[in-house]
Amino acid sequence: MRLDLVWVIYRAGSHSAHREACCCVDELQALGVKVVMAMSGVTANPFPDLLASEAGLPDLAVVLGGDGTVLGAARHLAVHDVPILSFNVGGHLGFLTHERCLLDGGQLWQRLLQDNFALERRMMLQAAVDSRSPAERTARPTASLQDLNGTKALHWALNDFYMRPYRDDVSPTCTLELEIDGEVVDHYRGDGLILATPTGSTGYSMASGGPILHPGIDAIIVSPICPMSLSSRPVIVPPASRLVIGLLGENTRRVKLWKDGASGALLEPGQCCVVQRARHHALMVVLEQSPSYYRTLTHKLHWAGSLLNNQPSPS
């Protein structure tokens, strides 16, 4: 891997992440690498300015934080095919990150320069708000997301999109219609709907009763949030599916589209949200020689396997 330009992105508000970021900058600059350091958080999004800079795209983005910091980087960098190397510094579960200890030892950058790593491609989703009339939708049911969005940027997600009722004063339910490849599947009344990737299957979707999917599988998980019908269950659909979610009921109700937990768009009555697999993948640098997704699950979720694997062998 070439390392002419590297972005070092650290979690805002984390002293440990900032300290590690400074160490990375010093080590890379000692190797003659040009480095740009920036913080990322709920109120700090460095990527629009970084992408607009004259320096151009980096060869690598080093992300120091938790999964949320990685998700923010992936939403902006996947479309540019920028690889992401992430470490869990100041984060929580860290399904997407390497352990912090792999930052130590001074051999990390040489490994990258010698191509001693793997590149994992993670499926992403993209979405657009459809503001057309019912007649226009009927005439062009498969209009591209770019056509629907016009000059607005598409919404991207590595984990999930979800739609929930939007009100400032109360917490109402909503009724959402799900259409898959032109066929109405169900009406979900409850707190909303989650559309997740296999990567996002261990996040909000799992907390809502959805299944866990191996990231080597390309599929889309549809998980209702607290549905008011016992027959409303999560479903898994093929990755090439086109999903359209519309708001039913009172014409004063609005729903909010969220992307990986970040604000996306507000859907007014009559509008729909169209979601499908993104053309680009998130490129994740993997350092482990023999990575095991199941070992990660047992460790992060404290399954019995993590206890059994740590037991001493019988003599």
Curated annotation (Swiss-Prot):
Keywords for the protein's UniProt record, in alphabetical order: ATP-binding, Cytoplasm, Kinase, NAD, NADP, Nucleotide-binding, Transferase
Cofactor(s) annotated in UniProt: a divalent metal cation
One GO term describing the cellular component: cytoplasm
Keyword Transferase listed: yes
Location of the protein in the cell: Cytoplasm
Catalysed reactions listed for this entry: NAD(+) + ATP = ADP + NADP(+) + H(+)
Record-level GO BP terms: NAD metabolic process; NADP biosynthetic process
InterPro entries listed in its UniProt record: ATP-NAD_kinase_N, ATP-NAD_kinase_PpnK-typ_C, NAD/diacylglycerol_kinase_sf, NADK
Top-rank lineage group of the source organism: Bacteria
Residue positions binding NAD(+): D67, G68, N159, D160, R189, D191
NCBIfam families with a match to the protein in the record: PRK02645.1
Family statement drawn from the similarity comment of this UniProt entry: Belongs to the NAD kinase family.
Role description: Involved in the regulation of the intracellular balance of NAD and NADP, and is a key enzyme in the biosynthesis of NADP. Catalyzes specifically the phosphorylation on 2'-hydroxyl of the adenosine moiety of NAD to yield NADP.
Protein name, UniProt field: NAD kinase 1
Protein species of origin: Prochlorococcus marinus (strain MIT 9313)
